């Protein structure tokens, strides 16, 4: 594709009022667009007309191919990207206001002409009010999404599409599910407004491209199969997965392939497309993955990728840039599906370790972990550290991933492979050479998988057989003598102001720490994850780094991820967005509530990845391992009632409990057993697993009827019903609800947009959004809200259904 120019927004005048974002067509336009802007005087129609003429002049410049600011300088987007003849983003809104024709048809009386001029002046005034709102500092990404969803004016929608370029990338990324869902399920005007931004960002970021491709596939899956195949979402997804959106200034990277060893495998069964980073390994696979694009027969069969791949020597095609990452993800998902077929937890764990050991032979490669927030290459998976998590029917598992951070994923060389048995010397870090490979050696170790889709067939991978590996000496410059230095030397020693502490305080704190060192869990074959999750994160990082052949590198990082197969994480993603929005609201309103949103990657309608919460174990694991009440466990971990550590942990518990109680009430979160509530090392509780929210409940049993889960054990940790911390808890609940309802629209629109075209169980019934709005109690006074909070706390604490559900989980799943 060539350079892209975003057409200016077209704001068409109409004789009818512009619909408000809230959808109240009967209300005054001015009351909607000036809400929250402050006092704005009613402008004279002539002034409005003059302002419109100025905008028209800018539009004429825009159509002439000139994009300049009011100061005459080339424009730069707010997100830091230059215009570079692709994106035109004016300092003032690039809005085109089309005036009605001045010439009247023959026979029209002069009174009609006057009426037309009057309507034109009124429309111009209304458009000026809208422009003033769009130009104001109060116009943020949340308002832009609201107008894009609610407005029926193509001109307004096109203008908002242009304005997306002027917001920060991370602000727009938060609403990516909403943007793509609107693109798939709403009318063409909305789709046309959104597409230029999506295409532009896909050219910039490979991770953004992956996120878009995965979400487009997942949100299109609710459509009928015949409609889905020809939908706009499917077409955009194919465009993203092709090479057409690869940055134009980057040359196509040609894979460096070594002759395959004579293993007796047919070409269709060679699944490992090798780069020089691992070309020294002689690999024999008895697997049966999908045919890769390196097979010339497949190139003619595959509809999705044939148009975007180029033939090389009539035998090989250059892999599209997302292909290695897609196969990496596919491999992780296939492991989860195979684990689910095994009967015992111990067998699953052993199989998981073996599978990941095989996966390591394909690393390093040009792949990354999408849940991370920085550019990196995956170099190794410490397979012995992986654990299978608790699940009755499925086999979610937790892995740790070693990565090397880099400045730019696309342009940085893939790190050279270092064998596990490489002996490292004790030379100083100054003698550390750059361990990399040449530009020609950067082809990913994962082969292209054309038939990658959301159906079960595309995910299926036959069991991998034995893998025989020979490791001759690897030529990696002078990396044989890489120095080994301590983790302490890697930690940056930033200069800090001296802090003076009394010797008595130091002795007291040291004695408290020695007396109350956090306990370690015992290994349980039925729950192997408990020990792994209980280990402090920094200790785990140190231990894995010491045993890693890449641990000596200063840009080495350790990440973790939970891989889930057979679960629809689209509701989890929706819950993450709501939690993130509430967290931002409470920070803005300075309410000290604490919640921990964790990242979600939706891969398909039944698979995904989750960012683990570090230094946290479930309350079920706490009770099972310690055989103590929650309060006694706090005393064991943090010291007696009067210690600083206990008081700090108690405050953290109260602030997090209040935050999650409000979340559970607003979203109607169900399935709140102790396996889905974590407790971290600082005393916070963290709710996980938001698979049942809003209109859905487990098996539609309707067990949990209370507003949220508040057990007597929770109250005991707070100091009892008459304690100050319990009163503090109720005060936080009230403050949090008051703050949340001030920003109700920001929360509701996240949910409302995702309901469009969705078949998710959380949206069953026609009253989901109405009930959500009612839970904000906009009509209540603060005194009435205080009474409501008291009633909800009392009702939840005395709820018999909470006790029944906990008993049900204990009897059926053994959850304490």
Swiss-Prot record:
All copies of domain PIK helical, residue ranges: 61-242
GO annotations of cellular component type: cytoplasm; Golgi apparatus; Golgi membrane; membrane; mitochondrial outer membrane; rough endoplasmic reticulum membrane
Comp. bias (Polar residues): 278-297, 306-318
SMART domains (UniProt xref): PI3Kc
Tissues where this protein is expressed: Strongly expressed in brain, kidney, lung, small intestine, uterus and adrenal gland. Weaker expression in liver, heart, skeletal muscle, thymus and testis. Not detected in spleen.
Compositional bias segments (type: Low complexity): 10-29
InterPro entries for the chain: Kinase-like_dom_sf, PI3/4_kinase_cat_dom, PI3/4_kinase_cat_sf, PI3/4_kinase_CS, PI3K_accessory_dom, PI4KB-PIK1_PIK, PI_Kinase
Subcellular localization: Golgi apparatus; Endomembrane system; Mitochondrion outer membrane; Rough endoplasmic reticulum membrane
Chemical reaction(s) catalysed: a 1,2-diacyl-sn-glycero-3-phospho-(1D-myo-inositol) + ATP = a 1,2-diacyl-sn-glycero-3-phospho-(1D-myo-inositol 4-phosphate) + ADP + H(+)
Residues with PTM Phosphothreonine: 263, 438, 517, 519
Keyword hit for Lipid metabolism: yes
Molecular function in Gene Ontology: 1-phosphatidylinositol 4-kinase activity; 14-3-3 protein binding; ATP binding
UniProt-listed GO biological process terms: inner ear development; lysosome organization; phosphatidylinositol phosphate biosynthetic process; phosphatidylinositol-mediated signaling
Keywords, in A-Z order: Acetylation, ATP-binding, Endoplasmic reticulum, Golgi apparatus, Kinase, Lipid metabolism, Membrane, Mitochondrion, Mitochondrion outer membrane, Nucleotide-binding, Phosphoprotein, Transferase
Modified-residue entries (N-acetylglycine), positions: 2
Annotated disulfide bonds: none
Membrane topology: Peripheral membrane protein
Record region (Disordered): 1-29, 99-121, 250-318
One Pfam family, short name: PI4KB-PIK1_PIK
Region span, Catalytic loop: 668-676
Cofactors demanded by this protein: Mg(2+); Mn(2+)
Region feature (G-loop): 541-547
Regulation: Inhibited by wortmannin. Increased kinase activity upon interaction with NCS1/FREQ.
Quaternary structure and partners: Interacts with ARF1 and ARF3 in the Golgi complex, but not with ARF4, ARF5 or ARF6. Interacts with NCS1/FREQ in a calcium-independent manner. Interacts with CALN1/CABP8 and CALN2/CABP7; in a calcium-dependent manner; this interaction competes with NCS1/FREQ binding. Interacts with ACBD3. Interacts with ARMH3, YWHAB, YWHAE, YWHAG, YWHAH, YWHAQ, YWHAZ and SFN. Interacts with GGA2 (via VHS domain); the interaction is important for PI4KB location at the Golgi apparatus membrane. Interacts with ATG9A.
Protein name: Phosphatidylinositol 4-kinase beta
Taxonomic source organism: Rattus norvegicus (Rat)
